[in-house]
């Protein structure tokens, strides 16, 4: 169990607001960008250049594919979902993925290692520790500001010769043909481009055998094609901020289950924690309105003093919590990944890591199809991807939703069962290893390694 992460940044354009539905004109298309009457034909079009879409584009390009990325929000704008104040709890497998994409060195400067996780229930006697020693690694994961990840990805996207990066840009008029999918990309009024010739063009047509939607859970193009991920609200939101404490964290994260939802503290720097506090909506309104001193007092009362005395909170933000998945992640020549395909509760830090594995899996399937000279967007290729991700998506969704329902049950008998379970887990190393392997995505990475080994 990774510890709760902030809700996945590629799913929301800002606090309690949807992400941009369709991206808005090329930031750095190649100097020989086509005229509006001459479609440019990359191998894959990626709608959404945030964390998951950016990772997908780099993974595709690393294997030789030509990629066009269309992102709505200006890269440096506060509205950019990949550049907000949330934190990510990355698994060690995510670190390896980013290292393979050539961006981990930039991210690592901002990363704090999670060495162990303390899990407990407020007011209960059961508790357990999960340690990197349980799985023999250097760390269970890493806490990273989403802004650092987004900036590293965007720098690499602009540098990569195989990537045509349209940002800020809008994608409209998507048409799914028998042999290709086409979309019109319009440059925003304040967009910048790589050349004066490109700057003079307001619209360009992209055509490719495959289009990937990575533009979040409220994707307009997703609703028109494969359908949006059906989401069920938890009637909760996550309040996120960073607090100081009078104790060094020493790499320890906390997952504390309370009567209204999990409360997580993630090691942020030497004496700071990133806070992810699941709150019922009525309580969230009141907590957001508190003064800093009163908020710290409320947080201390909810969590206790195991992590020390809290002080000096940063600005708070809130994000709605929900779960669900698209009935079908793929349609004719279109596939959705990340929050465009599924939404999970941030408990156990699964959301972004799940979307990142979507990106790597799709890139691996496309790479295999290219080696075999197959149509990248044919039904068989998309079915292969959907089957590759079906089991893990369902497993992670059931796991995170199950945790919330089990720990949200206030019946005395269930409380006793929970505390016995936590206490029993503490003395069962095989169960710890199993839990950690599942939450770190080890099974999915094994499947992807097998696919890569078929090259």
Predicted segment positions?
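N-terminal Rossmann-like FAD-binding beta1-loop-alpha1 element of flavoenzymes
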Residues: 43-69
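N-terminal FAD cofactor-binding segment of flavoenzymes
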Residues: 82-122
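Conserved FAD-binding catalytic core of PHBH/FMO-like flavoproteins
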Residues: 98, 188-189, 198-205, 210-316, ...
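Conserved N-terminal helical subregion
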Residues: 40, 110-224, 232-237, 292, ...
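Extreme N-terminal leader/targeting segments of oxidoreductases
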Residues: 1-44, 59-63
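FAD/FMN-dependent oxidoreductases across multiple families
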Residues: 285-372, 376-377
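Glycine-rich FAD pyrophosphate-binding loop
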Residues: 61-83
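C-terminal helical "tail/cap" subdomain of flavin- and related membrane-associated enzymes
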Residues: 364-455
């Amino acid at each position: 169990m990774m510890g709760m992460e902030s809700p996945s940044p590629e799913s929301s354009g800002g606090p309690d607001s949807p992400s941009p539905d369709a991206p808005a004109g090329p930031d750095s298309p190649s100097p020989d960008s086509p005229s509006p009457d001459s479609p440019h034909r990359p191998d894959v079009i990626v709608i959404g250049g945030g964390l998951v879409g950016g990772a997908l584009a780099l993974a595709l390009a690393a294997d030789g594919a030509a990629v066009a990325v269309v992102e709505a929000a200006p890269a440096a704008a506060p509205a950019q979902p990949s550049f907000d104040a949330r934190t990510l709890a990355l698994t060690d497998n995510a670190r390896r993925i980013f290292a393979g994409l050539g961006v981990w060195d930039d991210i690592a400067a901002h990363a704090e290692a999670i060495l162990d996780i303390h899990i407990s229930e407020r007011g209960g006697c059961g508790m357990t520790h999960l340690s990197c020693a349980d799985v023999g690694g250097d760390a269970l994961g890493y806490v990273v500001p989403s802004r650092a990840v987004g900036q590293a990805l965007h720098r690499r996207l602009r540098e990569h010769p195989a990537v045509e990066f349209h940002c800020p840009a809008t994608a409209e008029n998507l048409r799914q043909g028998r042999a290709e999918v086409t979309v019109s990309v319009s440059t925003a009024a304040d967009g910048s481009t790589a050349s004066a010739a490109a700057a003079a063009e307001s619209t360009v047509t992209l055509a490719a055998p495959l289009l990937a939607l990575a533009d979040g859970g409220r994707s307009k193009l997703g609703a028109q094609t494969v359908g949006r991920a059906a989401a069920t609200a938890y009637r909760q939101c996550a309040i996120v901020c960073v607090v100081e404490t009078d104790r060094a964290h020493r790499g320890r994260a906390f997952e504390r289950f309370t009567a209204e939802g999990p409360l997580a503290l993630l090691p942020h720097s030497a004496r700071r924690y990133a806070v992810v506090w699941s709150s019922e909506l009525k309580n969230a309104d009141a907590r957001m309105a508190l003064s800093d001193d009163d908020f710290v007092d409320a947080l201390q009362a909810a969590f206790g003093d195991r992590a020390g005395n809290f002080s000096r909170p940063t600005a708070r933000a809130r994000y709605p919590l929900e779960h669900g998945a698209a009935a079908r992640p793929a349609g004719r020549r279109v596939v959705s990944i990340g929050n465009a395909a599924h939404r999970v509760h941030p408990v156990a830090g699964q959301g972004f890591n799940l979307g990142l594995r979507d990106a790597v899996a799709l890139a691996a399937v496309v790479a295999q199809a290219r080696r075999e000279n197959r149509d990248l967007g044919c039904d068989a290729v998309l079915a292969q991807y959907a089957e590759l991700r079906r089991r893990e998506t369902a497993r992670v969704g059931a796991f995170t939703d199950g945790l919330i329902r089990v720990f949200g049950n206030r019946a005395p008998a269930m409380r006793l069962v929970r505390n016995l379970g936590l206490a029993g887990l503490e003395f069962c190393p095989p169960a710890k290893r199993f839990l950690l392997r599942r939450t770190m995505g080890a099974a999915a990475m094994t499947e992807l390694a097998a696919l890569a080994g078929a090259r």
